[in-house]
Amino acid sequence: MRSTAAVLSILLPGALACLGYEGGVPKPTAHYSNSKVIEIAAGQVFDAGWAKYDRGSGACSGDSEGSWQDAVFYLHSGATLKNVIIGKDQAEGVHCDGPCNLEFVWFEDVCEDAITIKNDKAGQETWIVGGGAYHASDKIVQHNGCGTVNIINFYAEDYGKVYRSCGNCSSQCKRNVYVEGVTARDGGEVVGINSNYGDTATLKNVCTDASHPCVLYKGCAGGCEPSKVGYCSG
Protein backbone atom coordinates (compact mmCIF):
# COMPACT_ATOMS: atom_id res chain seq x y z
CA MET A 1 0.00 0.00 0.00
CA ARG A 2 1.33 3.40 -0.92
CA SER A 3 2.23 5.69 1.99
CA THR A 4 0.69 9.14 1.94
CA ALA A 5 3.63 10.42 4.00
CA ALA A 6 6.25 9.87 1.33
CA VAL A 7 6.78 9.40 -2.36
CA LEU A 8 9.64 6.99 -2.90
CA SER A 9 11.25 6.29 -6.24
CA ILE A 10 14.35 4.10 -5.89
CA LEU A 11 16.13 2.12 -8.57
CA LEU A 12 18.49 -0.74 -7.83
CA PRO A 13 22.19 0.24 -7.86
CA GLY A 14 22.87 -1.75 -11.00
CA ALA A 15 20.18 0.09 -12.93
CA LEU A 16 21.69 3.56 -12.78
CA ALA A 17 24.94 5.45 -12.49
CA CYS A 18 25.72 6.31 -8.88
CA LEU A 19 26.12 10.09 -8.85
CA GLY A 20 27.74 10.65 -5.45
CA TYR A 21 31.52 10.98 -5.87
CA GLU A 22 33.10 7.72 -4.71
CA GLY A 23 36.76 8.75 -4.93
CA GLY A 24 37.12 9.62 -1.25
CA VAL A 25 37.59 12.92 0.56
CA PRO A 26 39.48 15.41 -1.63
CA LYS A 27 43.08 16.19 -0.70
CA PRO A 28 43.11 19.46 1.27
CA THR A 29 45.05 22.45 0.02
CA ALA A 30 45.61 23.70 3.59
CA HIS A 31 44.62 22.84 7.18
CA TYR A 32 43.19 25.25 9.77
CA SER A 33 42.30 24.44 13.37
CA ASN A 34 40.22 27.08 15.11
CA SER A 35 39.36 27.53 18.77
CA LYS A 36 36.02 29.16 17.92
CA VAL A 37 33.24 28.57 15.43
CA ILE A 38 33.49 30.42 12.10
CA GLU A 39 30.33 32.42 11.42
CA ILE A 40 29.13 33.18 7.89
CA ALA A 41 26.79 36.15 7.71
CA ALA A 42 23.33 35.98 6.18
CA GLY A 43 23.47 35.80 2.40
CA GLN A 44 27.27 35.63 2.27
CA VAL A 45 29.43 33.01 0.51
CA PHE A 46 32.46 31.34 2.08
CA ASP A 47 34.61 29.51 -0.49
CA ALA A 48 37.26 27.55 1.40
CA GLY A 49 39.24 26.65 -1.72
CA TRP A 50 39.39 22.99 -0.61
CA ALA A 51 41.08 23.70 2.70
CA LYS A 52 40.39 21.48 5.73
CA TYR A 53 38.92 23.05 8.87
CA ASP A 54 38.45 21.60 12.34
CA ARG A 55 38.32 22.63 16.02
CA GLY A 56 41.59 21.07 17.19
CA SER A 57 42.67 17.78 18.72
CA GLY A 58 40.23 16.28 21.21
CA ALA A 59 37.22 18.34 20.05
CA CYS A 60 35.18 15.20 19.43
CA SER A 61 34.23 13.60 22.73
CA GLY A 62 31.82 10.98 21.44
CA ASP A 63 28.29 11.37 20.12
CA SER A 64 26.92 13.71 22.81
CA GLU A 65 24.68 16.50 21.54
CA GLY A 66 26.52 19.79 20.99
CA SER A 67 25.45 23.34 20.23
CA TRP A 68 26.22 25.76 17.41
CA GLN A 69 29.20 27.05 19.39
CA ASP A 70 30.78 23.60 19.06
CA ALA A 71 30.46 23.61 15.26
CA VAL A 72 33.22 24.31 12.76
CA PHE A 73 30.95 26.62 10.72
CA TYR A 74 27.78 28.48 11.69
CA LEU A 75 25.74 29.75 8.74
CA HIS A 76 23.13 32.45 9.14
CA SER A 77 20.04 32.46 6.93
CA GLY A 78 20.82 32.21 3.22
CA ALA A 79 24.58 31.79 3.67
CA THR A 80 26.63 29.48 1.44
CA LEU A 81 29.60 27.28 2.35
CA LYS A 82 31.49 25.62 -0.48
CA ASN A 83 34.59 23.63 -1.41
CA VAL A 84 35.64 22.62 2.09
CA ILE A 85 36.69 19.58 4.09
CA ILE A 86 35.55 19.28 7.70
CA GLY A 87 38.21 17.36 9.64
CA LYS A 88 37.61 14.71 12.27
CA ASP A 89 38.50 17.00 15.19
CA GLN A 90 35.10 18.57 15.83
CA ALA A 91 32.05 17.97 17.98
CA GLU A 92 29.63 19.45 15.42
CA GLY A 93 30.28 20.05 11.74
CA VAL A 94 28.03 22.70 10.21
CA HIS A 95 25.06 24.45 11.85
CA CYS A 96 22.59 26.48 9.78
CA ASP A 97 20.36 29.06 11.46
CA GLY A 98 17.70 29.20 8.77
CA PRO A 99 17.97 27.88 5.21
CA CYS A 100 21.50 27.55 3.85
CA ASN A 101 23.48 26.23 0.89
CA LEU A 102 26.27 23.67 1.15
CA GLU A 103 28.18 22.98 -2.05
CA PHE A 104 30.84 20.27 -2.12
CA VAL A 105 31.25 20.09 1.64
CA TRP A 106 33.05 16.94 2.81
CA PHE A 107 33.17 15.40 6.29
CA GLU A 108 36.07 12.99 6.78
CA ASP A 109 34.84 11.52 10.08
CA VAL A 110 31.56 12.73 11.62
CA CYS A 111 31.50 13.13 15.40
CA GLU A 112 27.84 13.77 16.39
CA ASP A 113 25.91 15.23 13.44
CA ALA A 114 27.57 16.55 10.30
CA ILE A 115 24.89 19.11 9.40
CA THR A 116 22.21 20.62 11.64
CA ILE A 117 19.49 22.83 10.13
CA LYS A 118 17.21 24.83 12.42
CA ASN A 119 14.84 27.81 12.32
CA ASP A 120 14.01 27.38 8.62
CA LYS A 121 10.35 28.04 7.97
CA ALA A 122 7.76 26.39 5.74
CA GLY A 123 8.47 27.33 2.13
CA GLN A 124 12.20 27.90 2.71
CA GLU A 125 14.72 25.54 1.13
CA THR A 126 18.18 24.29 2.06
CA TRP A 127 20.40 22.84 -0.66
CA ILE A 128 23.14 20.29 -0.03
CA VAL A 129 24.81 19.68 -3.39
CA GLY A 130 27.74 17.32 -3.89
CA GLY A 131 30.15 16.51 -1.11
CA GLY A 132 29.83 13.63 1.28
CA ALA A 133 30.37 12.21 4.75
CA TYR A 134 32.11 9.21 6.29
CA HIS A 135 31.72 7.41 9.63
CA ALA A 136 28.57 9.04 10.97
CA SER A 137 27.47 6.67 13.72
CA ASP A 138 24.24 8.64 14.13
CA LYS A 139 22.97 11.21 11.62
CA ILE A 140 24.54 13.14 8.77
CA VAL A 141 21.75 15.71 8.36
CA GLN A 142 19.66 16.66 11.41
CA HIS A 143 16.65 18.79 10.44
CA ASN A 144 15.06 20.72 13.29
CA GLY A 145 13.35 23.47 11.29
CA CYS A 146 10.16 23.39 9.23
CA GLY A 147 11.28 23.89 5.64
CA THR A 148 12.55 21.65 2.84
CA VAL A 149 16.00 20.08 2.62
CA ASN A 150 17.29 19.10 -0.83
CA ILE A 151 20.19 16.63 -0.93
CA ILE A 152 21.66 16.24 -4.40
CA ASN A 153 24.52 13.99 -5.64
CA PHE A 154 25.82 13.45 -2.09
CA TYR A 155 27.97 10.50 -0.98
CA ALA A 156 27.56 8.73 2.38
CA GLU A 157 29.51 5.79 3.73
CA ASP A 158 29.31 4.09 7.13
CA TYR A 159 26.40 6.07 8.56
CA GLY A 160 23.31 5.73 10.74
CA LYS A 161 20.97 8.00 8.79
CA VAL A 162 21.66 10.38 5.93
CA TYR A 163 18.66 12.59 6.86
CA ARG A 164 16.48 12.66 9.95
CA SER A 165 13.52 14.88 10.59
CA CYS A 166 13.77 15.75 14.28
CA GLY A 167 12.05 13.03 16.24
CA ASN A 168 11.62 14.83 19.56
CA CYS A 169 12.12 18.58 19.15
CA SER A 170 10.23 20.61 21.74
CA SER A 171 8.24 22.24 18.93
CA GLN A 172 7.28 19.96 16.06
CA CYS A 173 6.12 20.68 12.49
CA LYS A 174 5.87 19.25 9.01
CA ARG A 175 9.23 18.86 7.24
CA ASN A 176 10.10 17.93 3.68
CA VAL A 177 13.17 16.26 2.20
CA TYR A 178 14.09 15.72 -1.45
CA VAL A 179 16.94 13.31 -2.19
CA GLU A 180 18.28 12.82 -5.71
CA GLY A 181 21.39 11.17 -7.11
CA VAL A 182 22.67 10.23 -3.66
CA THR A 183 25.00 7.29 -3.12
CA ALA A 184 24.75 5.70 0.33
CA ARG A 185 26.91 2.69 1.27
CA ASP A 186 27.32 0.52 4.35
CA GLY A 187 24.82 2.39 6.49
CA GLY A 188 21.35 2.39 7.97
CA GLU A 189 18.52 4.58 6.71
CA VAL A 190 18.79 7.10 3.92
CA VAL A 191 15.80 9.05 5.25
CA GLY A 192 13.82 9.01 8.49
CA ILE A 193 10.64 11.11 8.68
CA ASN A 194 7.74 11.58 11.09
CA SER A 195 4.52 10.35 9.50
CA ASN A 196 2.32 11.78 12.27
CA TYR A 197 3.46 15.34 11.51
CA GLY A 198 2.86 15.00 7.76
CA ASP A 199 6.52 14.90 6.72
CA THR A 200 7.21 14.14 3.07
CA ALA A 201 10.19 12.44 1.45
CA THR A 202 11.01 12.06 -2.22
CA LEU A 203 13.91 9.78 -3.17
CA LYS A 204 14.94 9.72 -6.82
CA ASN A 205 17.80 7.75 -8.38
CA VAL A 206 19.25 6.83 -5.01
CA CYS A 207 22.06 4.29 -5.20
CA THR A 208 22.13 2.40 -1.89
CA ASP A 209 22.50 -0.98 -0.25
CA ALA A 210 20.16 -0.02 2.62
CA SER A 211 17.47 -2.61 3.34
CA HIS A 212 14.91 0.13 4.00
CA PRO A 213 16.05 3.48 2.56
CA CYS A 214 13.04 5.43 3.83
CA VAL A 215 11.71 4.83 7.35
CA LEU A 216 8.61 6.22 9.03
CA TYR A 217 8.56 7.26 12.68
CA LYS A 218 5.97 8.49 15.12
CA GLY A 219 7.59 11.66 16.36
CA CYS A 220 6.96 13.35 19.68
CA ALA A 221 7.67 16.68 21.36
CA GLY A 222 10.16 17.21 24.15
CA GLY A 223 11.72 14.63 26.45
CA CYS A 224 10.48 11.50 24.71
CA GLU A 225 11.65 8.82 22.33
CA PRO A 226 10.18 8.56 18.79
CA SER A 227 9.12 5.11 17.64
CA LYS A 228 9.59 3.43 14.27
CA VAL A 229 6.21 2.68 12.68
CA GLY A 230 6.94 1.51 9.15
CA TYR A 231 8.60 2.16 5.83
CA CYS A 232 7.99 4.56 2.98
CA SER A 233 6.82 2.77 -0.15
CA GLY A 234 6.58 3.94 -3.73
UniProtKB/Swiss-Prot annotation:
Chain positions carrying an annotated carbohydrate: 168
Keywords from the UniProt entry: Calcium, Carbohydrate metabolism, Cell wall biogenesis/degradation, Glycoprotein, Lyase, Polysaccharide degradation, Secreted, Signal
PANTHER family registered for this protein in UniProt: PECTATE LYASE F-RELATED (PTHR33407:SF9)
Function: Pectinolytic enzyme consist of four classes of enzymes: pectin lyase, polygalacturonase, pectin methylesterase and rhamnogalacturonase. Among pectinolytic enzymes, pectin lyase is the most important in depolymerization of pectin, since it cleaves internal glycosidic bonds of highly methylated pectins. Favors pectate, the anion, over pectin, the methyl ester.
Name of this protein: Probable pectate lyase F
Enzyme class: lyase
Gene Ontology cellular component terms for the protein in this record: extracellular region
Gene Ontology MF terms: pectate lyase activity
Gene expressing this chain: plyF
Keyword Glycoprotein: yes
Cofactor(s) essential for the protein: Ca(2+)
Domain of life: Eukaryota
Subcellular location: Secreted
Catalytic activity: Eliminative cleavage of (1->4)-alpha-D-galacturonan to give oligosaccharides with 4-deoxy-alpha-D-galact-4-enuronosyl groups at their non-reducing ends
InterPro entries: Pectate_lyase_PlyH/PlyE-like (IPR004898), Pectin_lyas_fold (IPR012334), Pectin_lyase_fold/virulence (IPR011050)
Gene Ontology BP terms: cell wall organization; pectin catabolic process
Cofactor, free-text remark: Binds 1 Ca(2+) ion per subunit.
Signal peptide: 1-17
Assigned EC number: 4.2.2.2
UniProt key word Calcium: yes
One Pfam family it belongs to: Pectate_lyase
UniProt family annotation: Belongs to the polysaccharide lyase 3 family.
